[in-house]
Amino acid sequence: GKIELTAQVDGLFTLDRRRLYAVNSLGEMMIATRHAGPVKKGDKLAGMRVIPLVIEKEKMAEARETAGNTPLLTLTPYRALKVGLVTTGSEVYYGRIQDQFTPVIKAKLAEYGAEVTHHVLLPDDHAAVTEKIKEFLADGVDMVLCTGGMSVDPDDKTPLAIKNAGVNVVTYGAPVLPGAMFLLSYTDDGRPVCGLPGCVMYAQRTIFDLVLPYLVAGVPVTREQIAAYGEGGLCLNCKV
């Protein structure tokens, strides 16, 4: 008969595509999964069964060997992160325009149980932004998000500020629209420090929505993962 896996907690569902393909290529058995990504408690994760009525022991042993000794499917619970938010931009800092970025970020974080515990408004001063990133990290936040100042305009210096904070940059730029000017980095102890482009403020879904579940779950995001987003990375503004 069929066996189903369901999520016991809210979290990030991930899988090893190469090994899943290898197991399904053996024949006489199958594993069907949902796409990797955020799930809620009670969501179906996978279904599996043998195809014939009976199956040889040797075939099952081959499947176990092919699957390997590490989990083929993984559900990682979200962590209750403390987040530092650095909102940059002289227009916002001097009150010429309203800060519309912060409410959006707080709402997106709340979806995954994360909370902004440190927040500051700063002008386009990369040294001040760098100093505040370091201060938030020293205060023990689990992640720092910097909004604004991510384009190629000469006044936009947030990428420089992040790099000067002593982090390890994974990527500056992503093959996703909207969200191409995204910056992802990590501290030496694995805390994410990100630069968010302006599209995160007004677009329903961006690169930030793709990586945020990984950041909250504590699953490292690699340069290869970001590059792979190019296939399907063009948002068509589907109603979801």
What are the functions of these language-model segments?
Residues 1-78:
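Extended, charged alpha/beta regions that create polyanion-binding interfaces
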Residues 7, 49, 87, 195-197:
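Pocket-edge structural micro-motifs
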Residues 12-13, 53-54, 91-95, 201-203:
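Short, acidic Gly/Pro/Ser/Thr-rich loop/turn segments
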Residues 26-29, 67-70, 105-110, 166-169, ...:
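Short, surface-exposed linear patches
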Residues 41, 79-83, 140-141, 189-191:
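Short coil/turn connectors at secondary-structure junctions
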Residues 69-124, 128:
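Glycine-rich phosphate/diphosphate-binding loop of Rossmann-like nucleotide-binding domains
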Residues 90, 100, 117-240:
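Short glycine/threonine-rich loop/turn motifs
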